[in-house]
A protein has these predicted regions:
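Intrinsically disordered, polar/acidic, low-complexity terminal segments
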Residues: 3-68, 82-102, 107-119, 397-417, ...
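Alpha-helical transmembrane segments
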Residues: 10-24, 119-126, 182-186, 225-233, ...
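Transmembrane catalytic cores of multi-pass membrane glycosyltransferases
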Residues: 27-87, 91, 142, 194-410, ...
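Transmembrane alpha-helical segments
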Residues: 97-108, 154-166, 203-211, 276-287, ...
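Membrane-interface micro-motifs in multi-pass membrane enzymes
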Residues: 118-166, 194-195, 373-391, 436-467
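Membrane-interface transmembrane helices that cradle and orient dolichyl/undecaprenyl
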Residues: 155-179, 215-218
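Membrane-interface alpha helices of multi-pass inner-membrane proteins
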Residues: 177-196
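Cytosolic-side transmembrane helix boundary signature
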Residues: 406, 457-486
Length: 575
């Protein structure tokens, strides 16, 4: 294939990949109904008046800024697109996820080229799909996606020129670009006026990169204007009067131990969602360590010898191990339970309530409801983790990463030597550290829900992609292991994607029936509606986000928006 034909092929493959990502996300967004906070934001904030014009959008954003919080940019976008209509919002939200996938790929490659690595773009989208905590809440639900997804896109876009400038600086080049002075300032304002932890990280990074460039004689004016813009946005974010109103209500009486506990819980939840990413990063690190050690590799009787930069391969017998048998047994048990009523999760739930919560006196109805809600998703999450661990166990066998070989390589090559010898590993380590520090900023917040780790999880994904983009690292993944990873990726996407589409469609149909019932009731002059409870609580590993109408936020907002006096839903009945 000639270079021209190869370029055309990659362009077509990239366009096809992007179209597939957009179409999938558009379908999810189309079937996801408006609910919960969406109704509050369809009205001018705290007035009960539906938004009917652009001036109402601006007025609502200002009211929110004064009374609730500083995220004025994201609130403006949310109010604007809710006013413009759901179809346009669906398309814009799908486009934002595609943009984030592209930006994560570009940061991983440290290149703004779009069409050279369609496979890396597909992998970026897949890993974001699997690894972003509470995906349905932060990337599909409108009120959540505008806060997290729509904040991450301008922030990652803003940081890309700094990243590229640092790269060319290391190659002895300079990135002046005088035309970028004003655009970078404006983009900096958007990036800084986003969400609290990401805004702080972006501002510090911008000033840090600017100072580093100045000390190395590669300073460009756009670096400083961008940093100043980010600082201006950050000030606008944190100085909002509404922040102090909300903090007084949520966190004024919370001590440092509560903040530390929130930090541990938030970081821990993120790492659980990042399990496939972390295992692949660890595998890449061990492969680099083994390559640098020069040790021969044995894979079930197959001898791999490092000869220069090539591998000499014999044969592979394969085999069944105790670990794989244990993992398969647990997987089959949980799968059988999942499709026959969830009796394993129910047994664990009842045992914890009887043996832990009851002796501690934690048996309030809300506590039991919240714990039951967690256990409703236990089996599908456990099945997901076990499938990943099985894949990881088999991949180690195919790559010859036995305990003995890993220990032998570690004795000869330290982690410091790996970082010195592998630029991709150094860059990935920086991204991982950046993600952890980005979360650490939230120690000042009264709460730290798992969804707030959104941008940090994206940084971890970029770290893995940076490793896999490096030819010296990628070559360590032998062909059978690559085939296994492709098959596993396809199965995980097919399972989670199909489940998310089906469940979202089901929730959308149920919600549409309720809206029709409300409209019929209002046409008859009635102000009270009765809904049956939606019994299906499965959420496809949190890729679907929907709360029934007995939730106070949904009920109160919908009553005000539709002019109702009461919405009645039967109480929850634990299975």
């Amino acid at each position: 294939m000639t270079p021209a034909n190869d370029g055309g092929h990659r362009y077509g493959a990239t366009a096809l990949t992007a179209a597939a990502i957009f179409a999938f996300m558009l379908a999810l967004n189309h079937w996801m109904p408006l609910h919960r906070d969406d109704y509050d934001y369809m009205m001018v904030w705290k007035t009960g008046v539906p938004i009917a014009s652009l001036s109402d959008v601006l007025s609502s954003a200002m009211q929110h800024y004064l009374l609730h919080g500083g995220r004025m940019v994201t609130v403006f976008c949310l109010d604007l697109f809710l006013w413009l209509g759901k179809p346009l919002f669906d398309a814009a939200n799908a486009l934002m996820f595609l943009a984030l996938s592209v930006l994560v790929m570009m940061h991983a490659r440290r290149s703004a080229a779009l069409t050279r690595t369609p496979g890396l773009l597909a992998l970026a989208a897949l890993l974001l799909w699997l690894s972003l905590p509470h995906f349905g809440e932060v990337a599909v639900w409108k009120s959540g996606s505008t806060v997290y997804l729509w904040s991450a896109v301008p922030a990652f876009l803003f940081l890309l020129p700094y990243n590229l400038a640092l790269k060319v600086m290391g190659e002895g080049q300079r990135a002046r670009h005088a035309w970028a002075i004003l655009p970078m300032f404006l983009l900096g304002v958007l990036a800084g006026w986003s969400i609290e932890n990401l805004a702080v990280t972006v501002t510090l990074l911008a000033f840090g990169c600017t100072l580093y460039a100045r000390r190395h004689g590669a300073f460009a004016p756009w670096m400083l204007t961008g940093a100043v813009g980010a600082l201006a946005g950050l000030i606008g974010l944190v100085a909002a009067p509404g922040n102090y109103v909300r903090y007084d209500a949520q966190g004024a009486d919370k001590g440092i131990l509560i903040h530390l506990g929130n930090q541990i819980a938030g970081q821990g939840e993120m790492l659980l969602y990042l399990l496939p990413v972390l295992l692949l990063i660890y595998t890449a690190y061990r492969l680099c360590q083994r390559r640098l050690s020069g040790l021969p590799v044995e894979v079930h009787g197959s001898l791999f010898l490092y000869v220069g930069k090539k591998h000499v391969v014999a044969f592979d017998k394969g085999g069944i191990t105790t670990v794989s048998v244990a993992l398969w047994s647990l997987l089959l048990l949980l799968t059988a339970s999942y499709f026959t009523g969830g009796w394993v999760a129910s047994a664990i739930r009842d045992a914890v309530i009887a043996g832990v919560l009851t002796p501690l006196g934690q048996t309030r109805p809300k506590t039991i409801f919240l714990f039951t809600n967690v256990m409703n998703g236990f089996e599908e999450m456990a099945i997901y983790w076990l499938a990943i661990l099985l894949c990881y166990h088999r991949m180690k066998e195919l790559l010859g990463l036995t305990t003995a070989s890993v220990r032998a390589a570690a004795q000869q090559v330290s982690w410091r030597e790996v970082l010195r010898a592998c630029p991709a590993a150094r860059y990935a380590a920086c991204l991982i550290g950046l993600g952890l520090c980005n979360n650490l900023v939230m120690i000042a917040a009264p709460t730290f829900p798992g969804r707030a780790t959104f941008s940090s999880a994206a940084m971890f994904v970029a770290a893995l992609l940076a490793l896999l983009n490096d030819p010296s690292v990628r070559s360590e993944f032998f062909l059978p292991a690559c085939r296994l990873l492709r098959e596993a990726a396809f199965l995980l996407l097919a399972y989670t994607g199909a489940a998310a589409l089906l469940l979202t469609h089901e929730m959308g149909t149920e919600d549409a029936a309720r809206i029709a019932q409300i409209e019929a009731a209002r046409a008859r002059g009635e102000t009270v509606v009765h809904f049956p409870r939606i019994e299906n609580t499965r959420r496809a590993l949190r890729h679907v986000y929907y709360e029934d109408w007995d939730n106070g936020v949904t009920r109160d907002g919908a009553m005000e928006y539709f002019g109702l006096t009461e919405i009645e839903v039967p109480p929850h009945r634990p299975q």
